[in-house]
UniProtKB/Swiss-Prot annotation:
Gene3D superfamilies: Mur ligase, C-terminal domain (3.90.190.20), Mur-like, catalytic domain (3.40.1190.10), NAD(P)-binding Rossmann-like Domain (3.40.50.720). InterPro entries: Mur-like_cat_sf, Mur_ligase_C, Mur_ligase_C_dom_sf, Mur_ligase_cen, Mur_ligase_N, MurCDEF_pg_biosynth, UDP-N-AcMur_Ala_ligase_MurC. Its main location: cytoplasm. Its EC number is 6.3.2.8. Pathway: Cell wall biogenesis; peptidoglycan biosynthesis. It catalyses: UDP-N-acetyl-alpha-D-muramate + L-alanine + ATP = UDP-N-acetyl-alpha-D-muramoyl-L-alanine + ADP + phosphate + H(+). GO terms for molecular function: ATP binding; UDP-N-acetylmuramate-L-alanine ligase activity. Belongs to the MurCDEF family. It comes from the Bacteria. This is UDP-N-acetylmuramate--L-alanine ligase. ATP binds at residues 112-118. NCBIfam families: murC. Cell wall formation.
Length: 450
């Protein structure tokens, strides 16, 4: 790896993709600083583990930096980026730093449009509890380890690999998981064909001794199989995949299922996390664990004790007979899976959703699909679009989604005021805050109100 004790500065250090890398670098002995627009639990945590944190962006923040790390959300007009250019300080994308961290390890990458964070978390914990002591970089907080990153002494690094801007193609894994491929990030790829081609390239870059572990339930994944030139293992809930979950039982406080590997039953799992989509995510982690020689009993014990990931079907609290759940889902497929999981666990309770659309481009491309994805919701309140750094697009507002919901016979209204919203709630209601922006704050505020 590069020279020790570097002064490394992150612009937007509180971001989910940046904070984990920063923490690993701190644990490697580097001096890490970073800036963000506001103080958050993440920036406070990084401060506690040794990072120098600046609130707000300023050219003064990089005075000691030897390299500046940015994400795609950071503009080239950012004052810290401008100052770094003037001072001839190298400016690199977060993926370049991640590649550097992974260079001297055997990388396990978790890719796919949906389910990456949970699958990365499950896989990381399977390797951790299986005695492999991996380095871990995840896009969400793994509750069992109380962090989204860990520096391990073992040979492996488990990475949540982001396909949104094609940057996952720079990683060179020995094992890669593909959870699914769906119509997202087409503002970058232009077409589904280009998106599929990127996944094929990522899979085929693994060495001849590596393995791709792919979800055959997903139609697009099945379509790319003829183009795969490396060893692969399939997993899923349908058909005859190499790793299959059968006898799935969704009960009040757990989901149980039997696991078959190469048509033979290897054991059973009884997990605490909600949703059949998480059964699928568990199968991916099982596949990685078995491929690396971890016993099924160890893998199953890890999955059974898995507490989940922050902002993924996370129960925030229950008060006066009403429950508040938060989820990061921001694509129609994710929305539908999340609502279905909640309804399976609490079919008798009214499900009320506070939905915050994420990005103007996604809203423009998928508003019709969003309108069809809320069929399991009893009532939906739609917030304004969370821009995630994008510039507004003419005539693209959350009203597009609202109108699509109404046309699909979903009871939906525009959100205006939380106190007014709380007055319409009843004992037994489940309130879901849904979206990749800051809608989770509404849930915390609501718990204080009711």
């Amino acid at each position: 790896m590069f020279l020790k004790n570097q002064n490394i500065h992150f612009v937007g250090i509180g971001g989910s993709g940046m904070s984990g890398i920063a923490e690993v670098l701190i644990n490697l002995g580097h001096r890490v600083s970073g800036s963000d627009l506001k103080k958050t639990d993440v920036t406070e945590y990084l401060k506690a583990v040794g990072a120098k944190i600046y609130i707000g962006h300023s050219c003064k923040n990089i005075k000691s930096a030897e390299v500046v790390v940015t994400s795609t959300a950071i503009s080239r007009n950012n004052p810290e980026v401008v100052a770094a250019l003037k001072k001839r300080i190298p400016i690199i994308a977060r993926i370049e730093m991640l590649v550097e961290l992974a260079r001297l390890k055997y990388a396990v990458t978790i890719t796919g449009t949906h389910g990456k964070t949970t699958t990365t978390s499950l896989t990381s914990l399977v390797l951790h509890n299986g005695g492999l002591d991996p380095t871990i970089v995840i896009g969400g907080r793994l509750k069992n380890l109380k962090t989204n990153a860990k520096l391990g002494r073992g040979d492996y690094i488990v990475v949540e690999a982001d396909e949104s801007d094609g940057s996952f193609l720079r990683l060179s894994p020995i094992i890669t998981v593909v959870t699914n491929i769906d119509n997202d990030h087409l503002d970058y790829y232009d077409s589904m064909e280009n998106l599929k081609e990127a996944f094929v390239k990522h899979i085929n870059c693994i060495p001849f001794y590596g393995t791709a572990i792919i979800c055959s339930d997903n139609e697009v994944v099945r379509k790319i199989i003829p183009q795969i030139t490396r060893r692969y293992i399939t997993y899923g809930l349908m058909g005859n995949p190499d790793i299959k979950a059968s006898n799935i039982k969704v009960l009040k406080n757990h989901t149980s299922f039997d696991v078959f590997y190469m048509r033979k039953k290897v054991g059973s799992v009884c997990m605490k996390i909600l949703g059949k989509h998480n059964v699928s995510n568990s199968l991916a982690a099982i596949g990685v664990g078995l491929r690396l020689g971890i016993s099924f009993s160890s893998i199953a014990d890890t999955i059974n004790k898995f507490d989940g990931v922050s902002r993924r079907l996370e129960i925030k609290g229950e008060k006066n007979g009403m429950m508040v759940i938060d989820d990061y889902g921001h694509h129609p497929t994710e929305v539908a899976a999340t609502l279905r999981a909640i309804k399976l666990f609490w079919p008798e309770r009214r499900l009320v959703v506070l939905f915050q659309p994420h990005r103007y481009t996604r809203t423009k491309q998928l508003f019709n699909e969003f309108g069809r994805s809320f069929s399991d919701a009893d009532f939906v309140k739609v917030l304004d679009i969370y821009s995630a750094g994008e510039q507004p697009i003419d005539e693209v507002t959350s009203d597009l989604i609202l109108e699509s919901l109404v046309s699909n016979k979903c009871k939906a209204e525009k959100f205006s005021d939380l106190e007014e919203f709380s007055k319409g709630l009843s004992v037994g209601d489940v309130v879901l805050t849904l979206g990749a922006g800051d809608v989770w704050k509404k849930g915390e505020e609501l718990l204080a109100l009711i």
